[in-house]
Amino acid sequence: MSKEKFERLKPHVNVGTIGHVDHGKTTLTAAICTVLAKVYGGDAKDFASIDNAPEERERGITISTSHVEYDTPARHYAHVDCPGHADYVKNMITGAAQMDGGILVVAATDGPMPQTREHILLGRQVGIPYIIVFMNKCDMVDDEELLELVEMEVRELLSEYDFPGDDCPVIMGSALGALNGEAQWEEKIIELAEALDNYIPEPERAIDLPFILPIEDVFSIQGRGTVVTGRVEQGIVRIGEEVAIIGIKETTTTTCTGVEMFRKLLDEGRAGENVGVLLRGTKRDDVERGQVLAKPGSITPHTTFESEIYVLSKDEGGRHTPFFKGYRPQFYFRTTDVTGTIELPEGVEMVMPGDNIQMKVTLIAPIAMDEGLRFAIREGGRTVGAGVVAKIFE
Protein backbone atom coordinates (compact mmCIF):
# COMPACT_ATOMS: atom_id res chain seq x y z
CA MET A 1 0.00 0.00 0.00
CA SER A 2 1.58 3.28 -1.04
CA LYS A 3 1.50 6.12 1.44
CA GLU A 4 -0.49 9.06 0.15
CA LYS A 5 1.50 12.24 -0.10
CA PHE A 6 0.74 14.66 2.73
CA GLU A 7 -0.30 17.97 1.20
CA ARG A 8 0.85 20.74 3.50
CA LEU A 9 -1.38 23.40 2.01
CA LYS A 10 -3.04 24.53 5.23
CA PRO A 11 -1.49 25.78 8.45
CA HIS A 12 -0.93 22.95 10.92
CA VAL A 13 -2.06 23.41 14.54
CA ASN A 14 -1.66 21.05 17.52
CA VAL A 15 -4.50 20.81 20.03
CA GLY A 16 -5.79 18.39 22.64
CA THR A 17 -8.60 17.68 25.07
CA ILE A 18 -7.98 18.18 28.80
CA GLY A 19 -10.28 17.98 31.84
CA HIS A 20 -11.68 15.78 34.60
CA VAL A 21 -12.16 12.02 34.25
CA ASP A 22 -15.50 11.01 32.67
CA HIS A 23 -16.40 14.53 31.61
CA GLY A 24 -16.39 13.38 27.98
CA LYS A 25 -12.95 14.21 26.52
CA THR A 26 -12.76 11.11 24.33
CA THR A 27 -16.42 11.33 23.29
CA LEU A 28 -15.80 14.95 22.27
CA THR A 29 -12.68 13.92 20.31
CA ALA A 30 -14.76 11.33 18.43
CA ALA A 31 -17.56 13.88 17.88
CA ILE A 32 -15.18 16.47 16.40
CA CYS A 33 -13.71 13.88 13.99
CA THR A 34 -17.14 12.60 12.98
CA VAL A 35 -18.92 15.93 12.52
CA LEU A 36 -16.03 17.66 10.73
CA ALA A 37 -15.57 14.65 8.42
CA LYS A 38 -19.28 14.83 7.59
CA VAL A 39 -19.27 18.59 6.96
CA TYR A 40 -15.80 19.26 5.52
CA GLY A 41 -14.62 15.82 4.42
CA GLY A 42 -11.90 13.66 5.98
CA ASP A 43 -11.78 10.45 7.99
CA ALA A 44 -14.14 9.87 10.90
CA LYS A 45 -12.79 8.03 13.96
CA ASP A 46 -15.08 6.23 16.38
CA PHE A 47 -14.92 6.34 20.17
CA ALA A 48 -13.48 2.83 20.55
CA SER A 49 -10.50 3.42 18.27
CA ILE A 50 -9.64 6.65 20.10
CA ASP A 51 -10.17 5.19 23.57
CA ASN A 52 -7.91 2.26 22.77
CA ALA A 53 -4.87 4.51 22.91
CA PRO A 54 -1.50 2.99 22.00
CA GLU A 55 1.33 3.20 24.52
CA GLU A 56 4.27 5.37 23.60
CA ARG A 57 7.58 5.86 25.29
CA GLU A 58 8.86 9.40 25.68
CA ARG A 59 12.20 9.69 27.53
CA GLY A 60 11.61 6.27 29.08
CA ILE A 61 8.15 7.17 30.36
CA THR A 62 5.21 5.08 29.19
CA ILE A 63 2.32 7.26 28.07
CA SER A 64 -0.92 6.19 26.43
CA THR A 65 -2.01 8.79 23.90
CA SER A 66 -4.41 8.86 20.98
CA HIS A 67 -3.59 11.06 18.00
CA VAL A 68 -6.33 12.02 15.57
CA GLU A 69 -6.40 14.51 12.72
CA TYR A 70 -9.18 16.64 11.32
CA ASP A 71 -9.64 19.60 9.00
CA THR A 72 -11.58 22.83 9.01
CA PRO A 73 -11.71 24.89 5.80
CA ALA A 74 -8.86 27.02 7.18
CA ARG A 75 -6.57 24.57 8.98
CA HIS A 76 -5.31 21.07 9.59
CA TYR A 77 -5.46 19.98 13.24
CA ALA A 78 -3.52 17.26 15.04
CA HIS A 79 -5.40 16.43 18.24
CA VAL A 80 -4.22 14.39 21.24
CA ASP A 81 -6.44 12.67 23.76
CA CYS A 82 -5.29 10.59 26.74
CA PRO A 83 -7.28 7.84 28.43
CA GLY A 84 -6.08 8.35 32.00
CA HIS A 85 -5.28 11.27 34.27
CA ALA A 86 -1.69 10.07 34.83
CA ASP A 87 -1.18 10.03 31.05
CA TYR A 88 -2.16 13.70 30.85
CA VAL A 89 0.24 14.65 33.60
CA LYS A 90 3.11 12.80 31.91
CA ASN A 91 2.15 14.07 28.47
CA MET A 92 2.08 17.71 29.50
CA ILE A 93 5.29 17.57 31.51
CA THR A 94 7.39 15.68 28.94
CA GLY A 95 5.94 17.73 26.09
CA ALA A 96 5.42 14.44 24.23
CA ALA A 97 2.46 16.12 22.57
CA GLN A 98 3.00 19.85 22.38
CA MET A 99 -0.26 21.82 22.34
CA ASP A 100 -0.78 25.19 20.66
CA GLY A 101 -4.13 25.25 22.44
CA GLY A 102 -6.22 23.07 24.72
CA ILE A 103 -9.92 22.19 24.71
CA LEU A 104 -10.99 22.06 28.35
CA VAL A 105 -13.96 19.71 28.70
CA VAL A 106 -16.21 20.36 31.71
CA ALA A 107 -19.42 18.39 32.29
CA ALA A 108 -22.30 20.79 32.90
CA THR A 109 -23.76 18.15 35.25
CA ASP A 110 -20.71 18.30 37.58
CA GLY A 111 -19.06 21.66 37.02
CA PRO A 112 -15.31 22.05 37.62
CA MET A 113 -13.79 19.09 39.53
CA PRO A 114 -10.33 18.49 41.08
CA GLN A 115 -8.70 17.35 37.82
CA THR A 116 -10.26 20.30 35.98
CA ARG A 117 -8.24 22.53 38.29
CA GLU A 118 -5.14 20.36 38.06
CA HIS A 119 -5.19 20.35 34.24
CA ILE A 120 -5.61 24.14 34.11
CA LEU A 121 -2.68 24.56 36.52
CA LEU A 122 -0.57 22.10 34.51
CA GLY A 123 -1.53 23.91 31.32
CA ARG A 124 -0.29 27.15 32.86
CA GLN A 125 2.94 25.57 34.16
CA VAL A 126 3.87 23.82 30.92
CA GLY A 127 2.90 26.75 28.72
CA ILE A 128 -0.29 25.78 26.87
CA PRO A 129 -0.99 29.28 25.56
CA TYR A 130 -4.73 29.16 24.81
CA ILE A 131 -7.70 27.34 26.30
CA ILE A 132 -11.17 26.95 24.81
CA VAL A 133 -13.92 25.57 27.05
CA PHE A 134 -16.41 22.94 25.89
CA MET A 135 -19.20 22.54 28.42
CA ASN A 136 -20.39 19.00 27.78
CA LYS A 137 -23.58 17.08 28.65
CA CYS A 138 -25.69 20.24 28.34
CA ASP A 139 -28.55 18.06 27.08
CA MET A 140 -28.78 16.65 30.61
CA VAL A 141 -29.28 20.04 32.28
CA ASP A 142 -32.68 21.73 31.95
CA ASP A 143 -31.88 24.72 34.12
CA GLU A 144 -30.46 27.66 32.14
CA GLU A 145 -29.24 29.29 35.38
CA LEU A 146 -27.24 26.21 36.32
CA LEU A 147 -25.43 26.34 32.96
CA GLU A 148 -24.58 30.00 33.55
CA LEU A 149 -23.32 29.19 37.03
CA VAL A 150 -21.01 26.45 35.73
CA GLU A 151 -19.73 28.77 33.01
CA MET A 152 -18.98 31.43 35.62
CA GLU A 153 -17.13 28.92 37.82
CA VAL A 154 -14.99 27.73 34.91
CA ARG A 155 -14.13 31.30 33.88
CA GLU A 156 -13.14 32.17 37.47
CA LEU A 157 -10.97 29.06 37.68
CA LEU A 158 -9.19 29.98 34.43
CA SER A 159 -8.59 33.54 35.66
CA GLU A 160 -7.20 32.18 38.94
CA TYR A 161 -4.41 30.50 36.94
CA ASP A 162 -3.70 33.56 34.76
CA PHE A 163 -5.68 32.53 31.69
CA PRO A 164 -7.99 35.26 30.35
CA GLY A 165 -11.11 33.69 31.88
CA ASP A 166 -13.41 36.45 30.66
CA ASP A 167 -12.27 36.13 27.05
CA CYS A 168 -11.94 32.35 26.60
CA PRO A 169 -14.61 31.02 24.25
CA VAL A 170 -17.13 28.77 26.05
CA ILE A 171 -19.22 26.45 23.89
CA MET A 172 -22.18 24.65 25.43
CA GLY A 173 -22.87 21.33 23.77
CA SER A 174 -23.33 17.59 23.98
CA ALA A 175 -20.57 15.43 22.52
CA LEU A 176 -22.75 12.33 22.66
CA GLY A 177 -25.65 14.16 21.02
CA ALA A 178 -23.35 15.28 18.21
CA LEU A 179 -21.90 11.78 17.84
CA ASN A 180 -25.46 10.46 17.51
CA GLY A 181 -26.14 12.88 14.67
CA GLU A 182 -28.48 15.29 16.48
CA ALA A 183 -28.40 18.50 14.43
CA GLN A 184 -28.55 21.03 17.30
CA TRP A 185 -25.50 19.42 18.94
CA GLU A 186 -23.61 18.95 15.65
CA GLU A 187 -23.88 22.72 15.23
CA LYS A 188 -22.06 23.15 18.55
CA ILE A 189 -19.14 21.07 17.23
CA ILE A 190 -18.94 23.36 14.18
CA GLU A 191 -18.99 26.30 16.60
CA LEU A 192 -16.11 24.71 18.54
CA ALA A 193 -14.15 24.24 15.29
CA GLU A 194 -14.70 27.92 14.45
CA ALA A 195 -13.46 28.88 17.92
CA LEU A 196 -10.31 26.78 17.32
CA ASP A 197 -9.76 28.59 14.01
CA ASN A 198 -10.35 32.07 15.42
CA TYR A 199 -9.10 31.97 19.00
CA ILE A 200 -5.85 30.00 18.65
CA PRO A 201 -3.40 32.02 16.55
CA GLU A 202 -1.33 30.26 13.94
CA PRO A 203 1.75 28.94 15.75
CA GLU A 204 5.09 30.42 14.82
CA ARG A 205 7.09 27.95 12.79
CA ALA A 206 10.39 26.82 14.28
CA ILE A 207 12.20 28.37 11.34
CA ASP A 208 10.82 31.85 12.10
CA LEU A 209 12.02 31.86 15.73
CA PRO A 210 15.46 33.19 16.83
CA PHE A 211 18.34 30.80 16.06
CA ILE A 212 19.28 28.15 18.66
CA LEU A 213 21.60 25.17 18.23
CA PRO A 214 22.33 22.92 21.24
CA ILE A 215 26.01 21.96 20.94
CA GLU A 216 26.62 18.21 20.82
CA ASP A 217 30.25 18.04 19.74
CA VAL A 218 33.25 20.29 19.26
CA PHE A 219 36.06 19.66 16.77
CA SER A 220 39.16 21.53 15.89
CA ILE A 221 39.98 21.55 12.18
CA GLN A 222 43.56 22.36 11.29
CA GLY A 223 43.90 25.68 9.52
CA ARG A 224 40.17 26.41 9.72
CA GLY A 225 39.38 26.73 13.40
CA THR A 226 36.72 25.27 15.65
CA VAL A 227 33.53 23.56 14.47
CA VAL A 228 30.54 22.85 16.71
CA THR A 229 27.93 20.33 15.62
CA GLY A 230 24.31 19.75 16.55
CA ARG A 231 20.74 19.89 15.31
CA VAL A 232 19.34 23.38 14.80
CA GLU A 233 16.44 23.58 17.28
CA GLN A 234 14.91 26.72 15.78
CA GLY A 235 15.71 29.59 13.44
CA ILE A 236 18.41 29.93 10.80
CA VAL A 237 22.15 30.57 11.07
CA ARG A 238 23.88 32.28 8.14
CA ILE A 239 27.53 32.77 7.27
CA GLY A 240 28.83 36.10 8.54
CA GLU A 241 26.28 36.40 11.35
CA GLU A 242 27.20 37.01 14.98
CA VAL A 243 26.35 34.13 17.31
CA ALA A 244 26.50 33.87 21.09
CA ILE A 245 27.82 30.85 22.99
CA ILE A 246 25.61 30.53 26.07
CA GLY A 247 25.52 28.42 29.22
CA ILE A 248 27.93 26.75 31.68
CA LYS A 249 30.58 29.50 31.31
CA GLU A 250 30.51 33.26 30.68
CA THR A 251 28.55 34.12 27.53
CA THR A 252 30.80 35.00 24.58
CA THR A 253 30.06 36.10 21.03
CA THR A 254 31.78 35.09 17.83
CA THR A 255 31.02 34.98 14.11
CA CYS A 256 29.81 32.05 12.04
CA THR A 257 32.31 31.66 9.20
CA GLY A 258 30.92 28.49 7.67
CA VAL A 259 28.07 26.00 7.78
CA GLU A 260 28.38 22.43 6.58
CA MET A 261 26.13 19.42 6.36
CA PHE A 262 27.36 15.96 5.32
CA ARG A 263 30.68 17.54 4.31
CA LYS A 264 28.92 19.94 1.93
CA LEU A 265 29.30 23.68 2.43
CA LEU A 266 26.10 25.67 2.83
CA ASP A 267 25.19 29.34 3.16
CA GLU A 268 22.90 28.65 6.10
CA GLY A 269 21.69 26.02 8.56
CA ARG A 270 17.95 25.78 9.18
CA ALA A 271 15.68 24.44 11.94
CA GLY A 272 15.69 20.63 11.98
CA GLU A 273 19.02 20.22 10.17
CA ASN A 274 22.12 18.56 11.63
CA VAL A 275 24.96 20.93 10.85
CA GLY A 276 28.50 21.87 11.71
CA VAL A 277 29.10 25.56 12.35
CA LEU A 278 32.58 27.01 11.98
CA LEU A 279 33.35 29.72 14.55
CA ARG A 280 35.85 32.53 14.02
CA GLY A 281 38.70 32.86 16.51
CA THR A 282 37.17 30.41 18.95
CA LYS A 283 39.49 27.93 20.63
CA ARG A 284 38.58 24.28 21.04
CA ASP A 285 38.53 24.70 24.84
CA ASP A 286 36.23 27.75 24.78
CA VAL A 287 33.21 25.65 23.83
CA GLU A 288 31.71 22.46 25.24
CA ARG A 289 28.78 20.13 24.84
CA GLY A 290 25.76 21.45 26.75
CA GLN A 291 26.23 25.05 25.70
CA VAL A 292 24.04 26.51 22.97
CA LEU A 293 24.84 28.60 19.97
CA ALA A 294 22.15 31.28 19.63
CA LYS A 295 21.23 34.64 18.19
CA PRO A 296 22.81 37.16 20.62
CA GLY A 297 20.34 38.46 23.21
CA SER A 298 17.58 36.00 22.32
CA ILE A 299 18.08 33.54 25.19
CA THR A 300 19.86 33.93 28.54
CA PRO A 301 21.61 31.59 30.98
CA HIS A 302 19.97 30.87 34.36
CA THR A 303 20.54 28.70 37.43
CA THR A 304 17.35 28.99 39.51
CA PHE A 305 13.84 28.18 38.37
CA GLU A 306 10.45 26.85 39.43
CA SER A 307 9.58 23.58 37.70
CA GLU A 308 6.80 21.06 37.32
CA ILE A 309 8.15 17.53 37.74
CA TYR A 310 6.91 13.99 37.12
CA VAL A 311 8.82 11.32 39.04
CA LEU A 312 9.03 7.95 37.29
CA SER A 313 7.38 5.05 39.07
CA LYS A 314 9.31 1.91 39.96
CA ASP A 315 7.60 0.07 37.06
CA GLU A 316 8.86 2.69 34.64
CA GLY A 317 12.42 2.03 35.76
CA GLY A 318 12.46 4.94 38.18
CA ARG A 319 13.46 5.05 41.85
CA HIS A 320 12.16 2.47 44.29
CA THR A 321 12.24 4.88 47.23
CA PRO A 322 11.08 8.45 47.85
CA PHE A 323 13.46 11.41 47.88
CA PHE A 324 13.62 14.25 50.40
CA LYS A 325 14.80 17.84 50.56
CA GLY A 326 18.51 18.10 49.88
CA TYR A 327 18.17 15.62 46.97
CA ARG A 328 20.92 16.39 44.40
CA PRO A 329 20.35 14.66 41.07
CA GLN A 330 21.55 15.70 37.61
CA PHE A 331 19.25 17.76 35.39
CA TYR A 332 19.66 16.86 31.73
CA PHE A 333 19.06 19.88 29.47
CA ARG A 334 19.24 19.31 25.70
CA THR A 335 22.64 17.63 25.51
CA THR A 336 24.17 17.59 28.98
CA ASP A 337 23.74 16.88 32.69
CA VAL A 338 24.08 19.63 35.31
CA THR A 339 23.90 18.87 39.03
CA GLY A 340 21.29 20.79 40.99
CA THR A 341 19.60 20.98 44.38
CA ILE A 342 15.85 21.02 44.96
CA GLU A 343 13.50 22.90 47.25
CA LEU A 344 10.15 21.23 47.94
CA PRO A 345 6.90 23.18 48.41
CA GLU A 346 5.96 24.07 51.98
CA GLY A 347 4.47 21.16 53.86
CA VAL A 348 5.90 18.55 51.47
CA GLU A 349 8.43 16.34 53.25
CA MET A 350 9.07 13.72 50.59
CA VAL A 351 8.30 12.83 46.98
CA MET A 352 7.27 9.31 46.00
CA PRO A 353 7.93 7.55 42.67
CA GLY A 354 4.89 8.22 40.43
CA ASP A 355 4.18 11.68 41.94
CA ASN A 356 4.01 14.96 40.12
CA ILE A 357 5.08 18.05 42.02
CA GLN A 358 6.26 21.65 41.73
CA MET A 359 9.77 22.31 42.95
CA LYS A 360 12.40 25.02 42.89
CA VAL A 361 15.70 23.93 41.34
CA THR A 362 19.11 25.56 41.71
CA LEU A 363 21.80 24.38 39.25
CA ILE A 364 25.54 24.52 39.95
CA ALA A 365 26.16 25.99 36.46
CA PRO A 366 23.95 28.23 34.30
CA ILE A 367 22.04 26.79 31.34
CA ALA A 368 20.49 28.70 28.43
CA MET A 369 16.78 28.47 29.15
CA ASP A 370 13.34 29.87 28.50
CA GLU A 371 10.11 29.03 30.25
CA GLY A 372 8.72 25.86 28.69
CA LEU A 373 12.11 24.13 28.29
CA ARG A 374 11.89 20.39 29.01
CA PHE A 375 14.52 18.40 30.93
CA ALA A 376 15.10 14.97 32.41
CA ILE A 377 16.15 14.20 35.98
CA ARG A 378 18.89 11.61 36.14
CA GLU A 379 20.96 9.71 38.66
CA GLY A 380 24.23 8.54 37.17
CA GLY A 381 22.82 8.43 33.65
CA ARG A 382 19.55 6.72 34.59
CA THR A 383 16.38 8.75 34.02
CA VAL A 384 14.26 9.03 37.17
CA GLY A 385 12.01 11.96 36.26
CA ALA A 386 10.94 14.52 33.71
CA GLY A 387 10.29 18.22 34.13
CA VAL A 388 9.56 21.53 32.53
CA VAL A 389 10.77 25.04 33.42
CA ALA A 390 7.67 26.91 34.63
CA LYS A 391 9.18 30.17 35.89
CA ILE A 392 12.73 31.55 35.89
CA PHE A 393 14.06 33.29 39.02
CA GLU A 394 17.68 34.17 38.20
Curated annotation (Swiss-Prot):
UniProt keyword terms in alphabetical order: Cytoplasm, Elongation factor, GTP-binding, Hydrolase, Magnesium, Metal-binding, Nucleotide-binding, Protein biosynthesis
Sequence segments annotated as region (G5): 174-176
Residue positions binding GTP: 19-26, 81-85, 136-139
Gene3D superfamilies, A to Z: P-loop containing nucleotide triphosphate hydrolases, Translation factors
Recorded GO MF terms: GTP binding; GTPase activity; guanosine tetraphosphate binding; translation elongation factor activity
InterPro entries, alphabetized: EF-Tu_GTP-bd, EF-Tu_GTPase, EFTu-like_2, EFTU_2, G_TR_CS, P-loop_NTPase, Small_GTP-bd, T_Tr_GTP-bd_dom
CDD domains documented for this protein: EF_Tu (cd01884), EFTU_II (cd03697), EFTU_III (cd03707)
EC number in record: 3.6.5.3
Region (G2): 60-64
Name the record gives this protein: Elongation factor Tu 2
Gene source species: Photobacterium profundum (strain SS9)
